[in-house]
Amino acid sequence: MSESSFLVSLLASGSSGNATYIETPQRKILVDCGLTGKAIAAQMEKIGRSVADIDTILVTHEHVDHIKGIGVLARKYGMDIYANEKTWKAMERKNIGVIKQEQKHLFEPGVTKTFGDIDIVSFSVSHDAASPQFYAFQKDQKQFVMLTDTGYVSEKLRKLLYNADAYLMESNHD
């Protein structure tokens, strides 16, 4: 992998589970963990990666198809987990198990954080969850935007998608 690139791999999508892997030379990030820990490990193996190498999990919202394996992975591998305050409270009510305080981090909507060699912007979306958010990943003038589980695409989100070099947009309805 070159210093100016990043890899995006969709591990799972849909009501049975969601997980997306994003890798840069310095960071290995999982967005959502809606499969069991074993299933995430198997999906990572399929793309030639190890679940043990993931250093960060970003959570979009607390629905089980986005957080099913988060507690297991956090306890087994010690990964840092980022979510906004309302999502953390909602996840804890869903009994994700004990996660060490030093692994829990806040990432509120509208904030940009730098993770090694990649900047990540969080943004609010419309969905039936405590405080759903999704992410835009920016590295070396390139931008990838993730947008799933949203009921409405605002003008701000539309502009973000329009200006992205690539984006992932999930569309499904039961």
PLM region descriptions:
Residues S9-A19, T56-I70, A74-R75, W88-E92, ...:
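Structured catalytic core of nucleotide-sugar glycosyltransferases
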Residues K38-A83:
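Active-site metal-binding motif and surrounding structural segment of the metallo-beta-lactamase
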Residues E85-F134, Q138-Q141:
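Metallo-beta-lactamase
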Residues V31-G34, I54-E62, Y82-E85, V145-D149, ...:
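Active-site neighborhood of phospho(di)ester-bond hydrolases with catalytic His/Asp-centered motifs
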Residues M1-I47, Q133-D149:
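Conserved beta-strand hairpin/beta-sheet module of binuclear metal-dependent hydrolase folds
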